[in-house]
Amino acid sequence: MLLKPEEDPGLPSAYRPISLTNTISKLMEKLVVKMYNQHIQKTLPNSQAGFRPGSEINDQLLKVINPIETAFRKRFITTIAALDVQKAFDTMWHDGLRFKLATNNMPPHFTRWVSHFLTNRSAKVAVHGELSQSFPMKAGAPQGSAISPTLYNLFVADIPQPFHPRVGLAQFADDTCYWATGNHTPNAYRLLNDQLVRYTNWTNKWRITINPDKTQAMLIRPTGRTIDPQKYRVQLHNQPIQYQPTMKYLGLTISNKLSLLPHLRATLKKTKLPLQTIRFLSQKNTKCPAKVRIHLYKCLIRPLFTYATPLLINYNQSQLEKLCLEERRILKICLKLPKTTPNILVYALAGLKPLPEYLNLTNKIYITRALNKPALPDMLHNPHPDTILHKLSLL
């Protein structure tokens, strides 16, 4: 059992059960997925990007942000809901999955193998050396199993697709996001709520539980358009979801004005803990070489600064400079340099490219890679001016 981040250790619901299947089982699971991968990919909808070959989080983030940003530049309204599936992997209905595999033209051998894989599973819980009695697992895909993400993707493959051109859907495994745009708030609000009714009917049918307390909703509107948010609230199971000024989806935090300032603040906050480790190793009485401290920075902190690199092209000059200042401050700690050390010398001694140069190079590599993917070239063709995709296309 693993404690979930920022949860109360005294609550049983704060722990995530992890199943450590043996090596032979994991090998077999990977072989099965590889053998039937062509059938699996044909079954999954284009909205699903999680745990699929050739897909990455940046693609999905762009798929969500691009239509919303385009609507924003056209002074349209967008309502968006990021849905939280409660214990998604742990509550997957076994018989429901069997039915879907059998009716989606999956090979019978694959369906039977999956059925046997999920049959007669049991678990025990150990706490302080005390072992509970064995109990049957009547639902759920074993977390830690190599095939579980694929099984969950197949289970939710028939998710209700957008019923209107101005409604969008993005999935990354159990992370589900619907949005709707309109020239007026009532239009966007009505489209999204109609889509969510279809979605909740589907979740009820397949025993999927949505946690309304962790579901996020946001109303994105251009400056100057005054709207009463309380009048047009998103509803889930007839329960209103409070609009938030910011939303976090797949690790990216944006505001209702599409600003990345909340993401920058969250990023800088995340650096505090790894920076404490680097500070400790930079003390006089430690014998940790500078090369190791720089390596720790590259492994623990720079990935935080460069997460979702294509989206970071929307940082304004002030926000990017804050990130660069923090990077140089950390590098000076790693190298034990005075605060007045020139920036060129800091990067030369660290053996690193300056952050803006590194981000620019990474984006060029991403665009080259994205042009060979089926969906992104269409998005990159003639993007709306002053959007992320337009800026990327100019690199």
Predicted regions and their residues:
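Short, conserved micro-motifs composed of acidic
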Residues: 131, 194, 209-245
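Catalytic palm active-site di-aspartate
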Residues: 16-17, 48-50, 80-88, 114, ...
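Mobile genetic element proteins and their domesticated derivatives, centered on retroelements
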Residues: 16, 28, 32, 36, ...
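Active-site palm subdomain of RNA-directed nucleic acid polymerases
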Residues: 32-48, 73, 149-179
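Flexible, low-complexity interdomain linkers flanking nucleic-acid-processing modules
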Residues: 232-234, 238, 362-395
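Catalytic palm subdomain of template-directed nucleic-acid polymerases
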Residues: 88-104, 177-201, 259, 314
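Non-catalytic, peripheral interaction segments enriched in hydrophobic/basic residues
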Residues: 172-173, 204-227, 248-371
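Conserved pre-catalytic core of RNA-dependent polymerases
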Residues: 1-142, 180
